[in-house]
């Protein structure tokens, strides 16, 4: 399995490569709002690093976008996707992680089924635009405290299938899975429809370590039993020194 780090700054991306990560996952919103000079620095760096090192992105839409509710504007969403996905493509980004909790939250009193229909259409737009750029979209399920729709790996896989887009797939995040109290064993049956994953410690969303009490091996074992052996990114906080990141990279490879 390829091991990645969520990071959008040039210095830290270079450090991720130097300590042994296989790829980085940048923030779409960070890239989209970069000053031109900084974006050019990112393009230059992407050409200096091995092809595919800038592999994924998260933060797909800004929090003030509305993807559910009465204020959804599909033209605005498509326009943003067209512009931002193209900028990502110039960096070599191939996997787009669609979490975006604040933008997805269903407003109080709004019909849930209608909101789900909106998300299907939004994800179809993302899938169509991504396909033109040679990219895939994965739908990240989020803990219930953070979002009130698309909370489980089952939700993620179902939404991906409902779009009818071949380049849209499921996702699972160890931290969100554990926060929701979900059963790890279900991943074996879902793995064939998952295309990317995240990991972080289940309590403080920090760097996973061998002695933090979490059973990360079980997470990987169920995914591999189901046929998944693609990519996992560390998405979380903690003291990201070169020493700690080197240890993290080695630890995740050992699982």
Locations of the language-model features?
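Active-site acidic/histidine proton-transfer and metal-coordination neighborhood
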Residues: 67-169
């Amino acid at each position: 399995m390829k091991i990645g780090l969520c990071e959008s700054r040039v210095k830290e991306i270079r450090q991720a490569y130097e300590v042994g990560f296989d790829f980085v996952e940048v923030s779409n919103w960070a890239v989209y709002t970069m000053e031109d000079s900084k974006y050019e620095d990112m393009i230059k760096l992407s050409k200096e690093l091995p092809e595919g090192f800038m592999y994924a992105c998260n933060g797909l839409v800004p929090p003030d976008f509305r993807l559910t509710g009465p204020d959804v504007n599909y033209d605005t969403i498509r326009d943003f996707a067209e512009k931002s996905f193209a900028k990502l493509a110039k960096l070599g980004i191939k996997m787009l992680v669609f979490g975006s909790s604040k933008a997805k939250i269903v407003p109080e009193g709004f019909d849930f089924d209608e909101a789900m229909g909106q998300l299907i259409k939004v994800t179809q737009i993302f899938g169509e635009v991504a396909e033109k750029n040679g990219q895939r979209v994965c739908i990240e399920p989020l803990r219930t405290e953070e979002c009130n729709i698309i909370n489980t790996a089952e939700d993620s896989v179902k939404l991906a299938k409902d779009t009818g887009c071949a380049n849209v797939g499921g996702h699972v995040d160890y931290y969100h899975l554990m926060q929701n109290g979900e059963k790890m064993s279900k991943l074996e049956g879902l793995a064939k429809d998952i295309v990317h994953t995240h990991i972080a410690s289940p309590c403080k969303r920090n760097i996973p370590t061998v002695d933090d009490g979490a059973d990360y091996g079980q997470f990987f074992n169920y995914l591999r039993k189901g046929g998944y052996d693609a990519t996992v990114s560390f998405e979380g906080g903690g003291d990201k020194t070169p020493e700690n990141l080197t240890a993290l990279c080695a630890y995740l490879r050992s699982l």
